[in-house]
């Protein structure tokens, strides 16, 4: 149609005129491959970036996140360490102070407890204690939260632990695009970022748009995303639990309840504005997390909404959390301790008074 209009206006314009169209191809990618591609692209982009951790090099990582990177970049940039989290965490902090950009991989964040002194006392506080003169551009990454059948000592969610610390940014991505964009933003940040993954998400597949596949695609730290719009209730979650929130929204829709789902993406700083704007529409809120209720992310969001959105609330806020026990090993007890989709559905029905 554009060609015919131009023909009428000025035939001579058509001599070298072509209508250029661009197709936006989506690509299905696992979360594992999304993280791997982000690491690869940032290693190629900046020679100051390197990866250090247990089995990250020749073994390609315990979960194969670093597959192929040792062969491509060599042992000077993909560095295997002994099983001494406190040791290589301290080396990472010092290297970051010296101007490099370390990515420290923990086989699980449960093992990062051995290194928590360096993460909090060295890494998080350096910029403040130096009066803004010394930066600490380091990424602390690895699986967080409960996987399956690994017992109490390997199943904790550390979002609230690190989310309470000034000087840290804390992210917990869900989709493949989240993982790519937030990891790139974390690596390029001039101060420490705790990057919480989920072992149970590694094999999940998501579509990546043309834009999300771009090497310069970034997800801003501190910005939540509305994954599904709704008008009756707001459901807020992060990391793997967003999948359960989306499933719950589908079930609720069949029962006439329109749920808005917010993917928090960043734990610190929390994007309170996006939640407040959602509450202006729905007037009801359910928070969901895999961690414990006391002093958790849901508790913090509830406090923020009391301060910034009290007048918009038509019902008490519901918090759905993991059971207040160390994670059991027996599968039936483990299922009882973990958040299930039906827990979210029931909470949404309670706040909308549709549970009768």
UniProtKB/Swiss-Prot annotation:
Alphabetic keyword roster: Metal-binding, Mitochondrion, Oxidoreductase, Potassium, Pyruvate, Thiamine pyrophosphate, Transit peptide
How is this protein named in the record? Pyruvate dehydrogenase E1 component subunit beta, mitochondrial
User: Per the UniProt record, which EC number(s) apply here?
Assistant: 1.2.4.1
This protein's major location comes to mitochondrion
Q: Which reaction does it catalyse?
A: N(6)-[(R)-lipoyl]-L-lysyl-[protein] + pyruvate + H(+) = N(6)-[(R)-S(8)-acetyldihydrolipoyl]-L-lysyl-[protein] + CO2
Q: How does it assemble?
A: Tetramer of 2 alpha and 2 beta subunits.
What does the record give as cofactor?
Answer: thiamine diphosphate
One Pfam family in the UniProt entry: Transketolase_C
The entry's thiamine diphosphate-binding residues are 85
Q: Briefly state the protein's biological role.
A: The pyruvate dehydrogenase complex catalyzes the overall conversion of pyruvate to acetyl-CoA and CO(2). It contains multiple copies of three enzymatic components: pyruvate dehydrogenase (E1), dihydrolipoamide acetyltransferase (E2) and lipoamide dehydrogenase (E3).
At the top of the EC hierarchy, this enzyme's class is oxidoreductase
Which residues of the sequence carry a binding annotation for K(+)? 138, 186-187, 189, 191
Where is the protein situated, by its record's location annotation? Mitochondrion matrix
The molecular function terms of the Gene Ontology recorded here are: metal ion binding; pyruvate dehydrogenase (acetyl-transferring) activity
Per its UniProt record, what SUPFAM superfamilies does this chain match? Thiamin diphosphate-binding fold (THDP-binding), TK C-terminal domain-like
GO cellular component terms, alphabetically, are:
mitochondrial matrix; pyruvate dehydrogenase complex
The transit peptide is at: 1-25
Instruction: Share an example GO biological-process annotation for this protein.
Output: pyruvate decarboxylation to acetyl-CoA
């Amino acid at each position: 149609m554009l060609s015919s209009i131009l023909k009428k206006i000025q035939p001579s314009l058509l001599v070298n005129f072509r209508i250029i169209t661009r197709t936006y191809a989506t690509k299905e990618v696992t979360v594992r491959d999304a993280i791997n591609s982000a690491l690869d692209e940032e290693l190629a982009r900046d020679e100051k970036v390197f990866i250090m951790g247990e089995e990250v090099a020749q073994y390609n990582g315990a979960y194969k996140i670093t597959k192929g990177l040792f062969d491509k970049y060599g042992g000077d940039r993909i560095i295997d360490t002994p099983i001494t989290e406190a040791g290589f965490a301290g080396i990472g902090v010092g290297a970051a102070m010296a101007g490099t950009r370390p990515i420290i991989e923990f086989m699980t964040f449960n093992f990062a407890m051995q290194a928590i002194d360096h993460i909090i006392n060295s890494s998080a506080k350096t910029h403040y204690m130096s009066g803004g003169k010394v930066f600490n551009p380091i990424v602390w990454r690895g699986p967080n939260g409960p996987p399956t059948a690994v017992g109490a000592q390997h199943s904790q969610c550390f979002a609230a632990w690190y989310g309470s610390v000034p000087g840290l940014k804390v992210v917990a991505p869900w989709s493949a695009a989240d993982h790519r964009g937030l990891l790139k933003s974390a690596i390029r940040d001039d101060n420490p970022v705790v990057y919480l993954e989920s072992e149970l998400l590694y094999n999940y597949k998501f579509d990546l748009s043309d834009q999300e596949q771009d090497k310069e695609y970034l997800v801003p730290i501190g910005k939540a995303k509305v994954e599904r719009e709704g008008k009756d209730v707001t459901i807020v979650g992060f990391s793997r639990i967003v999948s359960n929130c989306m499933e719950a929204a589908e079930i609720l829709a069949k029962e006439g309840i329109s749920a808005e789902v917010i993917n928090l993406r960043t734990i610190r700083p929390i994007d309170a504005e996006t939640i407040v704007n959602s509450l202006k529409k729905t007037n009801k809120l359910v928070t969901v997390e895999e961690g414990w209720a006391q002093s958790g992310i849901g508790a913090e969001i509830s406090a923020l909404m009391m301060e910034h959105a009290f007048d918009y609330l038509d019902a008490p806020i519901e918090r759905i959390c993991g059971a207040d026990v160390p994670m059991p090993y027996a599968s039936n007890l483990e299922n009882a301790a973990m958040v299930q989709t039906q827990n979210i559905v029931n909470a949404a029905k309670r706040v909308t008074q549709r549970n009768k």
